Amino acid sequence: MDKNTLIGFLLIGVVLFAFSWFNRPTPEQLEAQRRYQDSIAKIEYAQQLELQKQENKSALVEDSLENLPDSVRAQRLQQSFGVFGEAMVGTEDYTTLQNDVVELRISNKGGRICYARLKEYDTYNDEPLVLFDEKESNFNFTLVTATNRVVNTSDLYFTPVKGNDPNSVIMRLNTGEGSHLDFTYTLKPDDYMVQYQILGTGLNGVLAPSTNALDLLWEQDIRQQEKGRKFEDRYVTLNYKFMADDVEHLSESKSDSKQIPNRLKWIGYKDMFFSTVLISQEGFEATTLDSKAIPEGDVLKQFKTTTSVPFDLQGKEATNLSFYFGPNKFALLKSFDKGVSAEQQLDLEKLVPLGWGIFRWVNQYFVIPLFDFLGKFIHNYGILILLMTIIVKIILFPLTYKSYMSSAKMRVLRPQVEEINAKYPGQDKAMERQKATMELYSRAGASPMSGCLPMLLQMPILIALFMFFPSAIELRHQSFLWAHDLSTYDAIFSWNKYIPIITPYFGNHISLFCLLMTITNIFYTKYNMEMTNTGQQQMPGMKAMMYMMPLMFLVFFNQYASGLTYYYFISTLITIVQTLIFRYTINEDKLLAKLEANKRKPMKKSGFMKRLEEAQRAQQETLRKQQEAKKKR
C-alpha cells in the first residue's frame, strides 16, 4: 500500500468518526426515544390484554358469579353489562329449523345458525354432508350501548319465541321491559334460501343514539367434502358481488385478504360443489375479507368477513338478510333471478366456475343446456358423456374435415417439397427454399395455415368443456365402469407413502381414464405426425416435444375429475376413428391430380400472399447484402 492510499484511508476514518461524534443523539433525545418505545410497548400490551379480556369475558363472568346469590349476581351483571347483564349467563340450547333439503340448528347463545346439513348429499366417505358446525363457525354482531359499553351477541343468550309461521324461528334478546332485539329465521319448504331478519323494538335508550349500522364478524371453516383434497382445494374460494356489478373472488391457491370500500350485494364461502352465501338487500359496507389456506387436515381454508349492515334504531324497518346453504348447481342458482330486474339480480350462478368471456358463454348457452337435455332421458352419466361427445364431434365435423383435407393436400405435395429441398440445400439457401415452397402451395391451392384455423375455432368448445366437467355437481357420486365417482379421480392403483416430487404433483395414485387418455394421445400424436409430414425441415426437438405433451397431460390430469379424462379419452378415440376413415375414403391420387390442375391455372395471388412474398424478398435482399459484406472483409 503506497503513502497516498494510506493517507486517504486515514482521512476517510477521521471523517466517519467526526460525523458519528457530531451527529450522535443527545441524552435528552435518547431519553425521549426510550419513553416513546416504552409507550408503544405499553399500548401493545394493553391491546393484547384487552383482547384476552374480551375472549375470556363470558367464561370469567360465569365462573365468578356461579356461586353468588341471585340478587348479588344480578347486581354484578348490571354493573358490568347494563341491560345486557342477565343475558350474559345461561345454558346453551338449540332449535332445529328444517325442510326436506336442509337441516339447520340455531343456538340460543348468539342467536345464530351454528349447524347446517344438506340432506340430499353425502361426503365422499358416505357421511352426512355438514357445511359447518358450532366449532367451525362464528357469527357475531357488536352492540354499543347507550353507556358506551361494547357487547358481542355471541356472548349473549337469546330466548326462542314461537311465531305464527311454523317455518320460522324467532331468537329474542330481551333488554328490559318492552325492549328487545329479534333475529327471525324463515325456511320455506324445499328451499335452500333462509330469510334472516333483524328487528329492534324499544332500543332507543339501550343502544348508542348514533347507531345506524351493526358491525358483523362472520367466520367459517371449509371442510373437505370430496375425495381429492388437492383437487377440491383449487375450487375453494371466497366470492363476493358488488351492488349491481360483477362477481369477484379472493385467491384460490394461497391465503389472501382484501379491503373493499364499495358496497357488496353478497359474500359467498364457496367449496367445490357447495356454498354458504350471506346476502343483503341494502348492501354490506366497509368490508374486509380474509382467506387463510390450511395445507393439511380436514379443513381446506378458513374464511373471515368483517363488515357492517344497516340497522334502524327506531325499529320502523327491519334489516333484511338471507342465507343460502346449498349446492353449486347452475340451474338452481340461476332460478333465484327469475322475474327479477337486472339491477336486483343476485348472479349466484357465477359461483360455478365456467370460465370467462366466450368460454363461459359457450358453457351457459350450449354445453349446460345440452347436458341438462340429455339428462332428462339418460340417467347413466357415463353414457350421457359418450353421447355428448359424439354430438360435439358431429357439430365440429365440418371444421375437422377441412383440417384433414388441408393436411392431405400437404401430404400429397410432399414429394415436390422434397425436390425443392434437394434443389436448395443448406442454410444459406433457406430463403430460396422457403420462397419456392410457398409458390408451390400457392399454385396448387394449398396452405399450411388452412389446417390451423379450423382447430383454432374448436378451442372455445374444448376449453369450455374443460371448465364444465370438474364443476358439474351432477357427476358427483355417479359411477361408471370402474369409476365410483365421475367428479373425482378413478384410482386403479394407489399408495400411502410420500414420494418427493411425485406425490405433490402427480399424487399417490394412478387414474385409469387418465392413463387411457394418455395412451390414445400418444398413439394419435405418432400417427398424426406421420400423416402430416410435409417434407419440410422441423425445428430441433419438435418431435420430442410432441411426445412430451401427452406425458405432461398424464401428470396434470391424474388428480382431475374422471368425467373429464373419460371425455378426453372418448374424444381422442373418435378423432382417431375419423382420421382413419378420412385416410381410407379420400383418393389421394385424385386429390393430387386436382392440385396439379390448379397449378396450370392462372394464379391469383391474395393480398396476404403478396405481402408474404414481399417480406420474403426483403429478407432475401437483406441476407444477400450481409453475405456480400462478409466477402469484402
Identify what each model region corresponds to:
Residues 1-64, 106, 196-202, 210, ...:
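Helix-loop-helix
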Residues 53, 57, 61-93, 100, ...:
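Non-transmembrane, membrane-proximal soluble domains of secreted or membrane proteins
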Residues 70-71, 78, 85-347:
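Soluble non-transmembrane domains of integral membrane proteins
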